[in-house]
Each structure stands twice: as C-alpha cells, then as structure tokens.
Amino acid sequence: MKLHKASAAAAAVLVLSLTATACGGDSDSGDGGGKKITVGIKYDQPGLGLKTPDGKFTGFDVDVATYIAKELGYDAKDITFKQAPSAERENLIKNGDVKFVAATYTINDKRKAEVDFAGPYFLAHQDLLVRADDNSITKATDLNAKKLCSVTGSTSAQNVKEKLAPKADLQEYGGYSECITGLENKAVDALTTDNSILAGFAAQKEHQGKFKLVGLNLSDEPYGIGLKKGDKDLQTKINAALKKMVDDGSWDKFVKANFGPANYKTEPAPKVTEGS
C-alpha cells in the first residue's frame, strides 16, 4: 500500500513538472534567454515596414523593433514579425498576440486609454500625396471637392474630416497599397497619412515620377512603441533601448538607410517622454 502511495505521489510530481514545462516553453520572455518574441509591424509601408516578395522585412520600424528586441535579450532569429494593420494594433497588444508594436503608431490620448507607449522615437507630419501632374490641390481646403483616400483606423482620416476639410469625400481602404492603386487609377484624388509613409511610397522604383508630396504639415505625429497597459517594466526597458539607439548612432544610421533615397528631410530624434 505504501508503495502504491509513493508511486502515485511521484507520478503527480512528474505530471505537474511536465505541465509547467509545456506552459512555459514557447512563451515570450521579457529578458530573452532563448525565448521567442513576436513584434507587430506594418507589411505594406516602404521605408518603414514592408514584407518583400521573398519574405524578408525591411524599413525603419523594422530596424527599430529589431534593435529593441536585441536590447531585451533576443537574437534576430528569435524575432517573429506579425502584421499589425492600423485598426488592429490595440487588439493585438491587449490579446497578447504581440509583445510590442512598432508600426507608425502615433501616440495620442485615445490610444493611451487602451495601451501604453514607450518613446516617442520619431516625429512625422501629416501630408498629402497627389498625382505628379495634378496642381489642383495645394492646401487642405482644396480637399473639400476631392476624393480623399486614407486607411481605416488611421488618425489621418479623422484629422482631415473633423478639422481640415469636412466636405471631402473620404474613401477608407484597408491598406496604403490600395490607396496608391486608387490614386494612380484616378479613383481617388489624394492620399493622406504621415509624410514619412508617403515619401516611402513615392520613392519606390515603380512609383518614381508618378506622385508628389504637397508639402503640408497638417499635424504632428510622434511615433511610439505600443505595449500592454500597465507593463511599466517593459516600458522602462524599451525607453532605455530607444535612448541608447540614439546615443550610439543607430537611429541616424536607420534613418539614412531607409529615408535617404526619397530625399525626405527628417527631424532630429525626439526626446523620450512616455513613462517619465
């Protein structure tokens, strides 16, 4: 009888041990240690976050996210990039589908009610992209008689509709690539979003000479790293990584590599203020 009890106890310990191993083996770890990490980025933004046909990831946000992950203790091979469309970023963070999001994610009060941010790490401005031969749009009010394209979930569309051109015919598409196609085919007259995103598209080889930026600074767009609300430890670590990225010259290197070909004039790295 004692033998049976001992065997049962040993079996119970073994089951508990195996269960703990199964639960913890593949999860993200804030300090790396051989674990994997999933990061949300854009897949359709040249110069910022782009998944190429051969499955590689390029862009400023990709470089920033990779730098942060390495500072958190992860190797490049341990990073999985997950698509983070504008309308899905908060859900991806809250559901734990990603550890953090680096996807042209403008810091604002509405979003901060749902998620926390580290940063900012980049300052962009809202602008307009039009066809190269179109001189009818030179200011925001010209949009009142035009079809304006933006991406669902983006702050740019609300900014234009509420403050700048309330009579604009707003066309919300699922991705920027769709807006670019619509602009080229004259289904829409202009695309609005951050100038960094627009410059990336305009600089693509297949788009060179077809489009131009109007040159309007319609808003300030401070990009931050989105993370789960209340995770102060991760916020502190990411802020430290961002500061180091600027101090060691990596930020300048990433900017030159990703925006240089578009002749896009970036502003200096903004001061990290979130969490302070």
Each model region followed by its residue ranges:
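A ligand-binding cleft/hinge motif common to bilobed small-molecule-binding domains
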Residues: 104-113, 161-162, 189-220
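Extracytoplasmic small-molecule ligand-binding "clamshell" domains
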Residues: 31-101
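Short helix-initiation/N-cap motifs at beta->coil->alpha
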Residues: 79-91, 135-136, 171-181, 185, ...
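Acidic, polar ligand-binding/catalytic clefts
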Residues: 79-142
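Periplasmic-binding protein-like
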Residues: 43, 123-130, 203-239, 261-276
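C-terminal motif of bacterial Sec signal peptides marking the signal peptidase cleavage site
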Residues: 17-22
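Extended ligand-binding regions for polar small-molecule ligands
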Residues: 24, 70-71, 134, 154, ...
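Bilobed "Venus flytrap"/periplasmic-binding protein-like clamshell domains
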Residues: 39, 46, 57-71, 125-178, ...
